[in-house]
């Protein structure tokens, strides 16, 4: 029993660390780093068959199709601009294809006959058969119309697997999310927030060949079609009343379909206004929150109309994350937008729960619904923020390029007493500053127009950046003195971009009321709120804040200790309860602890399992007999095969194995492709080439970044030597080890190891490479266009540096040329482990 949950927990934590989702190559101590991985979803090799073959012959009356303009446009923004004014009144062109299961590398090709020049959207009837969203590459007549078309996303659809589970105290846990087994219609759209409407493809009259290649995930493709863009008209108020007195109330947590696995029912036990509410136990009573913030994420509810007629829509919601701001949702009824106003429903800020009548309480929008089953979908949309986001991306890119130009002249540290003549040294410097000032002013004005509060932190950040740039322009002889403030403004704007298109929203209830219905008021009275607060206060005296999950009475539960934050622990507990506990019936008790394991075991109160143990802990505890030797468990070799070769070595002691890896870290090399290309530099394959690139960058006052961790406390030392610097990686690439084979000591004094050590130290002493740098910020602004960092930097750059999207790649670290002529790119690493204690009563299970 212990072994089963132990194996499951190891898998859960590895999933939690996102390694498998980020990199397919293994990484661990002396493991090979991943192959090149671009800043966006990478394209794979072209499938069998040449998609560039000419389109089939057509009748002479139809003629050959002329290519659409600007097919080489760099991105969709330029493509949209080049096709502005094209007709939207095309006719649906459904492909003739056989339904098929497609995996990575598979392609589908079909021809469509376009009667007249027009813009079309790509619509698929599909079903994802793997947990990963489907990523498709689109070619029109063998050419990708714009860069985003090489990575179109069609999300997997998720449903609740059964009802919410309850523990012995009545606390509800979220139901497991499983893939929907029904086909769904999806339109190719932008999920980054840079565009509100779906992608539109310009097709000239004639026959065109459409090729779809699977780049990511697996899917069942039932149907493909090119359809004219949806053009709902403005709302027209009906003249008559249907006199419908019915009303329908459905709960947010009862959603039947989601296109994001994280859109799960949630609990709010702090407010009496939510339905249902309870201060004593966990009740699932809403959906959304920060999980429902990404543009394009959608939730669907089913409802049934008994009487046909006009209905109004009310939302009981909470939007308490964007201070003074608004979020937007796109409403669809039965998959269609009822009218133009439904594309941008505005939800304002308030700390608590509030209600919104669609269209306003005085003149609510009335939507006609036939009797029978219907669906209601709310999709997160950036609304007018999409244009602001695009403008912000342009201005931050311009500021980043200008900062690199300034750094090339002044160096990283500015001499305030020196005149650098920036206005003369940098071509168009004054004009560039004017453009940045104008763009920032326009963005701030647009943001103020959208926000409900006149002054917010978002607008203040933009106004402050505008002020700094204006000071640089107005002081030509001392402009260099504002470099630090300019850098700070850039980083603040970049951080702002990371959340600019986030649209978090919580939905408690949705109410559809007939035009003559009287809906009862379900909001709590003053006395209800007071009673709820009193009950909530009293429960604090008996709450257990240490235990994240509990078990049924009479059942012996496995106790799991972790040292994470409560939010991370709750996520892990949800994974355990939804997967392991539900499948095996073995209860697991998750506890947050700060105590040391030895002290707990001496008192007889230790756990069965322990997660996130540092590199030194397993052997340290094994010496004292606190951990169980795992080498005797059946199936161990099969379990170890899931990890990188040698990942378990730090946990071996005296012939035994006392822990398994639960996280593994290794190094990647990150490059700013735009800067490297502008300077004529290529990706370095060896360390000699890397140093050569570093020298060329230093001539322009730019830098590289290398990983190094100063040992300031025992925690730093315990994290693992492989992740502190590149020295262990250099040893691995040279076929050397840091320790003797019998583990009797360190080999650093041996001649070969000392030579490698001297080479590593020489990077800092001979070539003056910086020891410690703020790589994330230096990389995003461009003053350190190449560097080596932990693989987690990939996630950080993807999530927090949207302004440089498509302008960087992550790839393997440089290598050492071996005697056989092969370049060894091995990377050392670090990680944490999980172990079973000797207090466990059922180790044989």
Question: Language-model segments: which ranges?
Answer:
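Sec-dependent signal peptide cleavage junction
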Residues: 19-37
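Extracytoplasmic
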Residues: 34-53, 57-511
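Extracytoplasmic/periplasmic substrate-recognition and gating elements
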Residues: 116, 307, 801-845
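Hinge/lid segment of periplasmic solute-binding proteins
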Residues: 538-554, 615-668, 691-693, 752-756, ...
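Short, well-ordered beta-strand elements
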Residues: 553-566, 580, 586-591, 609, ...
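Extracytoplasmic "Venus flytrap"/periplasmic binding protein-like
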Residues: 578-650, 673-685, 783-786, 793-809
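Extracytoplasmic/periplasmic solute-binding protein
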Residues: 653-658, 662, 667, 691-746, ...
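Glycine-centered hinge/linker elements that transmit conformational signals in sensory
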Residues: 742-772
């Amino acid at each position: 029993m212990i072994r089963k949950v132990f194996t499951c927990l190891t898998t859960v934590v590895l999933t939690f660390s996102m390694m498998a989702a980020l990199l397919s190559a293994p990484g661990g101590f002396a493991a090979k780093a991943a192959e090149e991985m671009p800043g966006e979803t990478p394209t794979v090799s072209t499938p069998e068959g040449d998609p560039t073959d000419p389109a089939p012959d057509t009748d002479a009356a139809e003629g050959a199709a002329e290519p659409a303009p600007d097919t080489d446009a760099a991105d969709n923004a330029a493509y949209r601009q080049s096709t502005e004014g094209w007709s939207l009144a095309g006719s649906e062109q459904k492909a003739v294809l056989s339904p098929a299961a497609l995996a990575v590398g598979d392609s589908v090709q079909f021809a469509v006959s376009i009667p007249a020049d027009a813009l079309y959207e790509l619509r698929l009837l599909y079903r994802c058969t793997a947990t990963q969203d489907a990523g498709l590459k689109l070619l029109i007549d063998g050419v990708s119309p714009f860069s985003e078309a090489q990575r179109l996303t069609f999300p997997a659809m998720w449903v609740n697997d059964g009802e919410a589970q309850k523990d012995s105290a009545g606390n509800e846990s979220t139901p497991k999310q499983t893939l929907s087994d029904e086909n769904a219609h999806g339109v190719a759209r932008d999920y980054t927030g840079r565009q509100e409407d779906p992608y539109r493809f310009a097709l000239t009259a004639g026959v065109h060949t459409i090729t779809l290649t699977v780049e990511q995930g697996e899917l069942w493709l039932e149907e493909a079609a090119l359809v004219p863009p949806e053009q709902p008209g403005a709302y027209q108020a009906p003249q008559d009343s249907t006199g419908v007195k019915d009303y329908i109330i459905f709960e947010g947590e009862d959603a039947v379909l989601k296109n994001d696995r994280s859109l799960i029912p949630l609990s709010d036990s702090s407010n009496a206004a939510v339905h249902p509410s309870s201060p004593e136990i966990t009740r699932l009573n809403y959906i959304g929150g920060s999980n429902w913030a990404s543009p394009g994420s959608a939730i669907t509810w089913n409802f049934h109309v008994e009487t046909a007629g006009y209905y109004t829509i009310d939302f009981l919601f909470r939007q308490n994350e964007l201070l003074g701001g608004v979020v937007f949702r796109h409403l669809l009824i039965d998959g269609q937008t009822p009218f133009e106003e439904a594309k941008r429903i505005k939800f304002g800020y308030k700390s608590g729960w509030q209600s919104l009548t669609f269209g306003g309480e005085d003149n609510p929008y009335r939507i006609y619904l036939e009797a029978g089953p219907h669906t209601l979908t709310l999709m997160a949309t950036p609304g007018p923020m999409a244009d602001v986001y695009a403008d912000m991306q342009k201005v931050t890119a311009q500021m980043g390029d200008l900062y690199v130009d300034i750094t090339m002249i002044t160096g990283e540290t500015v001499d305030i007493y020196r005149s650098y003549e920036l206005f003369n040294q940098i071509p168009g410097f004054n004009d560039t500053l004017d453009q940045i000032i104008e763009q920032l002013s326009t963005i701030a004005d647009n943001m103020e127009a959208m926000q409900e509060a006149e002054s917010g932190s978002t607008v203040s950040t933009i106004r402050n950046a505008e002020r700094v740039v204006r000071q640089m322009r107005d002081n030509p002889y001392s402009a260099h003195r504002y470099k630090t403030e300019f850098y700070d403004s850039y980083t603040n704007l970049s951080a702002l971009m990371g959340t600019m298109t986030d649209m978090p929203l919580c939905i408690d209830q949705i109410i559809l009321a007939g035009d003559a219905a009287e809906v009862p008021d379900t909001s709590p009275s003053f006395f209800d709120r007071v009673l709820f607060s009193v009950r909530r206060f009293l429960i604090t005296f008996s709450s257990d804040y240490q235990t994240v999950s509990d078990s049924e009475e009479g059942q012996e539960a496995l106790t799991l200790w972790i040292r994470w934050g409560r939010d991370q622990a709750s996520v892990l507990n949800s994974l355990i309860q939804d997967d392991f506990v539900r499948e095996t019936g073995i209860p697991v008790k998750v506890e947050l602890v700060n105590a040391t394991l030895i002290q707990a075991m001496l008192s007889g109160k230790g756990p069965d399992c322990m997660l996130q143990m540092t590199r030194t802990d397993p052997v340290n505890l094994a010496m004292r007999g606190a951990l169980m030797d795992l080498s005797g468990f059946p199936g161990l070799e099969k379990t170890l095969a899931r990890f990188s070769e040698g990942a378990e070595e730090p946990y071996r002691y005296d012939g035994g194995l006392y822990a398994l890896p639960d996280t593994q870290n290794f190094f990647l090399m990150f490059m700013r492709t735009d800067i490297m290309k502008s300077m004529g530099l290529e990706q370095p394959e060896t360390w000699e080439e890397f140093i050569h690139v570093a020298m060329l960058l230093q001539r322009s006052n730019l830098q590289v970044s290398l990983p190094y961790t100063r040992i300031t406390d025992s925690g730093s030392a315990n994290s693992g030597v492989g992740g502190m610097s590149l020295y262990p990686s250099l040893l691995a690439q040279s076929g050397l080890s840091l320790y003797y084979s019998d583990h009797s000591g360190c080999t650093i004094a041996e001649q070969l190891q000392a030579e490698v050590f001297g080479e590593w130290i020489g990077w800092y002493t001979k070539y003056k490479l910086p020891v410690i740098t703020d790589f994330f910020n230096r990389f995003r602004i461009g003053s350190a266009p190449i560097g080596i960092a932990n693989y987690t930097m990939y996630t950080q750059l993807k999530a927090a540096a949207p302004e440089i999207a498509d302008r960087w790649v992550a790839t393997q670290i440089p290598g050492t040329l071996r005697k056989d002529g092969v370049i060894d790119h091995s990377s050392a690493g670090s990680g944490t482990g999980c172990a079973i204690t000797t207090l466990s009563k059922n180790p044989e299970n």
